Design a protein with these regions (language model features):
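Short, contiguous alpha-helical
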Residues: 2-9, 17-36, 40-92, 133-187
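Acidic/histidine-rich alpha-helical segments that form the ligand environment
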Residues: 90-133, 145-157
């Protein structure tokens, strides 16, 4: 196998920005592989008393991508479809509302959010490194760095890729740490 068989792998000896973006993309790819190719039943399957579903995770992570790379990065609003959701309850409404979306809508929502995030990150990195300050700030005015946003998103994907691993195994037995060589989404 060659490096081109696993394009989602971070570089062996890259810059800090390349490693952060690479680690994030590896988790994104693994998550997408775990969620890929399912119908509505598979995307809505639950384990035990948990309300988590792969469909809910697709929608949640799409929202997190948009929130980090708009609101937190630049202070801009997220826009559609997030501006029409009633926020403020005990749980994230995107988890429950995913049951109303088709598999095609959920996959497209996540895929487009990730594409937007990659474009926004590339534009941001063209103007500086991970230490540049972003819009997100504490109440006393201390601003977060781009590094912090990337680490937060890596943490979010790490948590939910683990959830996706368990959910997918329960749906159809798919197991594994990494997608197969040259994998691309099928749905």
């Amino acid at each position: 196998m060659t490096d081109s068989d696993y394009p989602w792998e971070p570089p062996l000896a890259g810059t800090e920005a390349e490693h952060l973006a690479g680690a994030l993309d590896r988790l994104r790819t693994t998550f997408r592989w775990k969620a890929d190719g399912l119908d509505s039943t598979g995307l809505q399957a639950r384990l035990g008393v948990s309300e988590l579903t792969l469909g809910g995770l697709l929608k949640h992570l799409a929202r997190v991508e948009d929130e980090i790379f708009t609101v937190k990065l630049t202070g801009e609003p997220m826009g559609a479809p997030w501006d029409s959701i009633a926020w403020g309850g005990e749980t994230d409404p995107e988890f429950a509302s995913a049951a109303d979306d088709s598999p095609e809508q959920l996959y497209a929502l996540w895929d487009h959010a990730v594409a937007r995030s990659r474009d926004r990150l590339a534009a941001c990195l063209a103007n500086g490194g991970p230490d540049q300050l972003v819009h997100l700030a504490t109440r006393d005015g201390r601003q977060a760095s781009l590094r912090r946003l990337l680490c937060d998103l890596i943490e979010e994907y790490g948590r939910h890729t683990g959830h996706a691993d368990l959910l997918r195994e329960a749906v159809d037995g798919r197991v594994g740490e990494d997608p197969p060589p040259r994998w691309t989404p099928q749905s």
